[in-house]
Amino acid sequence: MNETIVVLLSIPGLRRQDVARMPRLAALARGGDQAALAPSFPAVTCPVQMNMTTGKLPREHGVVANGFYWRDRGEVEMWTAWNDVVQAPQIWDVLARERPGTTSAAWFGLLSKGCGADYVCTPAPIHNPDGSESLWCYTKPPELYGELRDTFDHFPLHHFWGPLANIASSEWIAASAVHAARTM
């Protein structure tokens, strides 16, 4: 049986000319197809990721920012909302409908908590009552993060964005994705 593998990578700031200096990514690109992305406005993480996973623009999928204002609670929620805020089918939803039996994964896409992908991993730190933070990831199935943590230690959230951002988070994401793909 011929197996088709589709990998959609979201690498902010990556330019086509940068790929040549990245041997593994260049090899992956040579083995498949590439498509240019024309970002929409606003060109921020959540709307652009939803553009990529739905094939729709913000006016159609409903995600117009990285945060959401919940009128009923009078609260702003940044980067942590669940997938039910997305108002258009995503690629894993279409695959499940059009190609039953296809396995899909959403790896470190924001707003992926509760999405229709078969496997999911995304940061979901636990904010404790004392103001401290416990490292954690939302995963589907729920026990997957325990396995990833046991294999790779906790996801290095503090190296994902902000002043301590560095390659450690990208290495964890790549290693965990490869591990999951090989063992799922």
What are these regions (language model features)?
Residues 1, 44, 170-172:
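A short catalytic or substrate-binding loop motif that flags glycine-/basic-rich loops and adjacent residues
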Residues 9, 20-23, 90, 172:
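Generic recognition of stable, solvent-exposed alpha-helical segments in well-folded globular domains
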Residues 13-14, 39, 109-112:
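An acidic- and aromatic-residue-enriched active-site/binding cleft used to recognize and process polar
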